[in-house]
């Protein structure tokens, strides 16, 4: 019944139930009572119109507040607010958009070219709004992106958004509806120059399945010696520490851990060249007069901290700050089981 929203389904069931009760009611008094019950149920179902907004914003919700888009599927509910922020089952998934600007959080997927000369084959685990996958599939050097997404509801979202709609028809994209960890286990010989995961919040259920030592070890097995992995630690010291346990070389880029078994050294000239050549749907991803200011992100070398996240740091700073943090494993469930 994924073609029918919860709101519409509630109305259909209400009408069917009311007609059935009216039909079996033996007396006029019973029919009046059924009508009264139906009227009360109508008011209740009518309140569903703002149900998701209320669940999302709770005491901050206001009468008439509406999401710009709501998509329901067997995997849950995807909502988009009027600022293009996307929420999956109530948790923030990011903002729809691909344009890079100075101080933008989108520096993270673009940062791959700051540390590697050539990236041709990329794996994305978790497509969500499609913004990062759109960025990566349009990378000037990339020849193929394999993208794994568990919820096909996000495909409906991508189709409806002009910023990312062309992703689904890009010949460089192979889109797979599956669980990312399962897909890796079933394709042991697959190798990628980069594996990218804008991982969900570390405290959400099942998050440890994408942050644990065992999972990152699986990721490492799908990289060549100089391959790189990038995943969101969502400001969890334990998630960052776990990455340091698995990989010999790490950087922290805002709230993302960038890791490899080969040295990672950002290069401004290399990054500048790639950004200058970058196009999505035929348009530059960044204005020419903003490239230098964006590259100045490389001068912000310090440990990223809440309130000061537009930074990056080397492994030594990560070790000093989080070296004593407990690692996340499949057994201890990380932050899911404090």
Could you say what each language-model-derived stretch is?
Residues 1-24:
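Membrane-embedded alpha-helical segments of integral membrane proteins
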Residues 17-22, 158, 167, 217, ...:
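Charge-rich, low-complexity amphipathic helices
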Residues 21-123, 179-186, 249-338:
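Soluble small-group transferase modules, centered on the S-adenosyl donor enzyme superfamily
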